[in-house]
Amino acid sequence: KETILLLDCLHIESKKIKFPLSKFQIVLFNSNVKHALEDGAYNTRRAQGEEGLSIIKKKFPQTLHFRDATMEQLSVVKNEMHQDVYKRCKFIIEEIERTKSGANYLKNGNIAAFGKCMYASHAGLRDLYNVSCPELDFLVEESSNIREVAGARLMGGGFGGCTINLIEQDHVAQIAETILHKYAAK
């Protein structure tokens, strides 16, 4: 109870981290944009990431996985990559670091810093991984203007669907109504 899981998909492990559900609530805002992952766009991004990791491995053979890669390594091989491949790799490396930092922020009870990680994650998904859409960006942007929303980002594979928002418990209903009204009016 009052925990979230930090999943390690490389080693198939999980860790429980304390999470103050009595103070915050996780709320999903649905963009009502249907994502069609079968069109191959997400698979293209995955392939671009694998291509980039392969280029990094050639120069740095000790780097077996993205979690071993650094931004310094990526900058060394940047000119050997297509710009889109570089952007995907940059997002992946930064997202791994955000995940580690975010887990530490939660362990230390720093919800504000964790929320900033959520917003940074969305920016990376939007600008580097290119899986957001205007509707998701609108929902995250509107949430970022509300003090009682600690953080927000798209969730899932992107290209539509929902945002996940970390909202102070006492303000959930009011904020949900505000966001719904603004979204319907746009």
Regions from the PLM with identified roles:
Residues E2-G151, N165-K186:
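C-terminal nucleotide
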Residues G161-T163:
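Structural motif
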